[in-house]
């Protein structure tokens, strides 16, 4: 029987997606996220509320590595990369890293128990790939394999991106998804009626993961995934460009985004912590965009910009 090694990283909730991505990049075959906020107001199987759950801003992200993995090297890399994330201004909190060994069947059960179907927006529901789910009329279901990490669609930055796409897309659009990760934004764009979607990520692992998630969803042959460094080599114009990545990276793509967004098109930027908000606004305004919508969840911000000559009801430019 094959055994697995389990590494648990305790970090601030704001670092959930970034740390999940990091763990996959270091060789993890899956992650599970334990967050006390998930239990607020919920009932257990007997109908009782969870009154004794201690609420905390810290979460536990558990990663699973094959027994052949050198955990000492992995943990050293994790600590080094966490320090780098903190230097970008991401709140990681007081980090602790634990590890243990477990059997394969324990690994399979452990990470799956944390993930259930989640209604993210009015129309969009994210469902784990192994779950049979009966969608209601008009409900659009995104199948994801959370063992692949790169975000499960429940983080505030992803939720706001999905909400923006739901508000903007009416059918027939071309969408560019920058830093696609799990591919969730591209899949949502397809389900919401976009004609063609181009998904880019600098990380080869993310490109593979995105394609595997896309393949789980019917009718998503209109999504084209490729490796790419932001928008530097892209020439395809788009009606909508969406990017849910760190603010320090967002400011590097605004000029190229303006070049590629069609007139009256939109730029959706998410993943912005409040202290970096002005920096992103300035970059987008300097590129020529006008601000149409500003969304906030906790310390996270998402911005919807428009490329337009009609500046009524918009800000900046």
Swiss-Prot record:
Keywords: Cytoplasm, Methyltransferase, S-adenosyl-L-methionine, Transferase. GO terms for cellular component: cytoplasm. Its EC number is 2.1.1.-. One of its GO terms (biological process) is methylation. It is found in: Cytoplasm. Transmembrane segments: none annotated. S-adenosyl-L-methionine binds at residues 158, 179, 201, 244. It comes from the Bacteria. Its main location: cytoplasm. GO terms for molecular function: protein-lysine N-methyltransferase activity. Disulfide bonds: none annotated. It catalyses: L-lysyl-[protein] + 3 S-adenosyl-L-methionine = N(6),N(6),N(6)-trimethyl-L-lysyl-[protein] + 3 S-adenosyl-L-homocysteine + 3 H(+). Pfam families: PrmA. PANTHER family: ELECTRON TRANSFER FLAVOPROTEIN BETA SUBUNIT LYSINE METHYLTRANSFERASE. Belongs to the methyltransferase superfamily. PrmA family. Methylates ribosomal protein L11. This is Ribosomal protein L11 methyltransferase. It comes from Streptococcus pyogenes serotype M3 (strain ATCC BAA-595 / MGAS315). The gene is prmA.
């Amino acid at each position: 029987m094959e055994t697995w090694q389990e590494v648990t990283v305790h970090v601030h909730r704001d670092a959930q997606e970034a740390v999940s991505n990091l763990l996959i990049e270091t060789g993890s075959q899956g992650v599970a996220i334990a967050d006390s906020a998930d239990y607020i107001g919920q009932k257990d199987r007997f109908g009782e509320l969870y009154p004794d759950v201690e609420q905390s801003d810290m979460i536990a992200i558990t990663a699973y590595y094959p027994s052949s993995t050198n955990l000492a090297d992995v943990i050293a890399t994790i600590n080094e990369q966490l320090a780098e994330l903190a230097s970008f201004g991401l709140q990681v909190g007081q980090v602790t890293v634990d590890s243990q060994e477990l059997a394969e069947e324990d690994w399979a059960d452990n990470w799956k128990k944390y993930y259930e179907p989640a209604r993210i927006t009015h129309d969009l529901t994210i469902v784990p790939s192994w779950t049979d789910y009966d969608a209601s009329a008009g409900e659009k279901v995104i199948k994801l394999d959370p063992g692949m990490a790169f975000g499960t669609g429940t983080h505030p930055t992803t939720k706001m991106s999905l909400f923006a796409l739901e508000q903007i897309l009416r059918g027939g659009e071309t969408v560019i998804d920058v830093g696609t990760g799990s591919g969730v934004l591209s899949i949502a764009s397809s389900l919401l009626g976009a004609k063609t979607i181009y998904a880019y990520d600098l990380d080869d692992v993310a490109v593979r993961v995105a394609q595997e998630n896309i393949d789980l969803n019917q009718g998503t042959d209109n999504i084209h995934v490729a490796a790419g460094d932001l928008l530097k080599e892209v020439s395809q114009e788009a009606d909508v460009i969406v990017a849910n990545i760190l603010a320090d990276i967002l400011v590097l793509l605004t000029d190229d985004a303006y070049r590629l967004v069609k007139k009256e098109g939109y730029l959706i930027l998410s993943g912005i912590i409040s202290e970096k908000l002005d920096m992103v606004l300035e970059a987008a305004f300097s590129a020529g965009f006008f601000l149409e919508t500003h969304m906030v969840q906790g310390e996270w911000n998402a911005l919807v910009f428009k490329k337009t000559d009609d500046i009524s009801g918009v800000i900046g430019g």
